Amino acid sequence: MLLLAVITTKFAEAQSFGNQAITYEELYDDPYAINKLFLHLQPLYADVFATNVNAGFGIGANYYLKDKADFQANFRQAYTRSFDLARDAAIKNQVIMNTPNNFTYFELGGTYHIKDEESDTETKLILYSRKYAKGNRWASHVPEHTVVPSKVRKIIGARAGGFAFDTSIDLKRITADQQVSLVDESGDPFPVQSYYYTNEIVTGGYIGGSMSWIKNMAIKPDKGYGVLVDDFIFTSFLDILIAPSIKLDTVQYRDPNLNNTIRKFAADVVDTKVWGFRLGMEGKYNRELGWAYGAEVGARPGIKGRGFYAMLKISVPVFSTSMNHSREAFGK
């Protein structure tokens, strides 16, 4: 009975505390007053690519040009051969002279703001009270929230840019799937039946559209709670990828049966696909020090039938600045 009374009392206290009306002071609410430059350190990305599954690190950057446009750049590279599956297999089963390349990816692009406007909305904020840290464990396990009026900035954009990536590929499996064979300059087939690999270099561009939502607001409740902030920047996008340049390195084989003569086998018998698509999203915070994430799914240009990919990247930390270092000066 005593235990039941204690639980009932604590529950009543939590309910009473949660039902209290909240008054607050608005500190700021301006989705246009965001930082201009964001620099990302990406300790982790994972790329489930039908051509080559890989994981690694990267760097990225975003720059916002007022309400006119924004620009982004990204570079990614596999950690080591153990996280670059096609390259690792190529080294373990190397029977040719080609050097397997590490997976690398580079992208540079921009978004023109076709429509960039502010509108009224509501923001849901999670409440945290100092009382939660004073043994009120019941309340701490039932997060409360409040909804306050705020502004949101919505951007409809037109995207364009370029990309390039370099990767090792399992040429033996690809030629078997496509039912083609490598032949040398004399028309003789490749003499080795074990696995052999080469490198693929793809260069192209993209064009698409995006939708962004930006909030940049903070309130200070009169008592009981800390400062509540919502400064999230979220972007979703859809792009068409076009790669006019898809290069497969010629396979070079030193044939021991022909006095170690170097024989060359062109890989142009492999079918490629010059276009693809992707659907993605990115999120970050308008803070001097924060974190961000991004995800994409789609099909990359390159080897026909091996373009599907799903990629996730995490940025920690993300540094940002308003790039406003001027100060007012007054004469005495």
Question: Where are the regions that the model predicts?
Answer:
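Outer-membrane beta-barrel biogenesis signature
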Residues: 14-38, 119-151, 219-231, 321-332
